[in-house]
Amino acid sequence: MSKKKRQTDHALLESWRPPRGAGDPLGCLTTTFTFDAGFFEEECLARFLEIDSLPDREGLAYLLERENRLGPTYAGVLVDHRQAGVDHSLRWDVLPVRIPRAKQHAKLSLLAWTNHVRIVISSGNLTQHGYRYNHEVAGTIELTSKEAAHTLLGESCGFLEYRETDTALSRRKFNRHYKQFLRQLSDSINTKVQAARGLPRDVRQFWSRVHRRSQQ
């Protein structure tokens, strides 16, 4: 998409910020085709973790705050293996995805805090142009203890679980951290679903099945 929009329009970036009362970050998992590691860390991840320091002005303070916020939090990016590169932090994962006779073009971000889960589906890659300049389309799916599009959220989680089988990386450390985050997320979602009032029985049963699969 070649048309540009003003750099002041950062609605897609702002979707990475936690809403009021979201709680502590659990982790984030996102997919993209092209990828800018510096942009992801300094713009997307910084918003998700609510990092106040600026990397270009407060270098040491930024690094210390990032390490402190990332400590218990998982962050991973699934990137088409042709675009993955090697420029990334050791504190979060870049997972190259290899799809036979195809490319990894999905742009889906799963952002999880202790009291809130958000799915962001967009047409924009994780780059400066994809998030700040191009005309892109985006939508969000929210889950709290009071409201959620449970079926859509379940399908999104299922997609991310399925993509794990396409990752070119076979290193057990990455797979273990990836699956650990999905299990933790499933625990959080299932607790919210079972505690929510007025949800249809089939929704509760659906998330119980998702939760059981994630623990396998």
Protein language model features and the residues they cover:
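PLD/PLD-like phosphodiesterase catalytic module centered on the HKD motif
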Residues: 1-216
